[in-house]
Amino acid sequence: MKKRTLLSLMGATALSFGALATTALAENPTDLNVAIVLSAGLESPWDGTLIEAFERTKTEKPHGLDISWTYTDPLWGDDAGDAMRLFAESGEFDIIWAHSTYSDQVEKMQAEFPDILFVVVGSGNEGLGGNQYWVYKRVHEPAYAIGVLAGQMTETNTLGVVGSFPADDVNDEINAFFNGARSVNPDIIQKVAFIESWYDPAKAAEMTSAQIATGADMIFSLAANFQPCEEAEILCFANFADQHSFSPTTVLTSVLANWDPDVNYIVDEWWAYKTDGAAYDGNTEIVWRGMSEGGAALAPFYELADKVPAEAKAVFDQTLADIMSGAFVVELDVAVPTSD
C-alpha cells in the first residue's frame, strides 16, 4: 500500500514537472515589438542603416521571434522624451530604441518601466546601466583602409573630409582616414570641415566645393553629398551606407555601418530577461563591434574597380586582412581633427 502510494506521488510529481515545463515553453514569447526614435530620418545613412539591419534581423527570426517595429520622425529633447513615454505607457512595446543621444530622456523613465529595454546609441550618452543599453558604432577600421587607398591614389597629396559634428564617433573615423593615408604617403595634407548637422546636403555641398577649390582631389564625405565631386570629376568615399548608386561615377567605395550584431545582442538580452528571468544588465561603458565582429565593413568598388591601381589595391587588401585577423590594430584617436 505504501509502495503504491509512493509511486502515485512520484507519478503526480512527474506530471507536475512536465506540466510546468510545457507551460514555460508555451509562455516563451513569439513576438517582439520595438519602438524606434529616429534622430535624422531614413534618408540619413545613420538612421537608414539601422532600419535595414532590423529588416535583415526580422528575416532571420532570432529565437523564432516575429519582430515588428514602428519609428518616429526625427525627434530631439523633450519631443523625443514625450514620444518615448507614449510608447512606454501604451504597453505595446518591449524595446524602445532611441537612435542617438537620448540617455537624459531615458533616465527620467527607466525606473518607471522596468520591463522595457531601452537603447541609446553613440557619443554624448551616459551609461546608466540597468534596463538601458548603450550601443556604440565605430567604423574607424574601414576608414583607415580607405585612407590607405586614398594616400596612394591622390595626385595632389591633398585629401578632404566633410563631417557632421566633431563628435567622438565622428572624429575617430576622420583621424583614422588620415592616419591610413599617411601610413603610405607622409606628404598628405588634410582638409577638414564640419557641417554642424547630422544631415544638411546643401551645407555639405558648400564644404565639399571649398575643399576641392583648395586642391583636394579625393573626398571622404560623411555628409552624403557627392555632386561637387561629380562636377570636379574626382573620386570620393561615402560613409555608413553603400551610396555608390547615388553617384556611380564618383563613389569608389563606402564605409559601412552594420547594426546587425548590435540588434541581435539587444534581442538576446531581452529574450534572456523574458525566458530565463535574467535581470537587465545594461553596459555603463562604451562597447562597440568592429570589422571582425561584423559591425563594420566596406562596399565593393563596382564598375570603378579599374580606377584602382594594382599596387594600391594590393596594399589595401593586405591592410584589410591584417585588420580582420588582428595582426594590425587601428589606432583609436578621438581628438577633434583640423585642417593643415
Predicted regions and their residues:
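A residue-level marker of the well-folded mature domains of exported/periplasmic proteins
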Residues: A26-D340
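N-terminal export leaders
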Residues: L6-L7
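Repetitive helical segments and hydrophobic/amphipathic motifs
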Residues: G11-T13
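N-terminal secretory signal peptides that target proteins for export/translocation
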Residues: M1-K2
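C-terminal segment of classical bacterial N-terminal signal peptides
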Residues: L15-A24
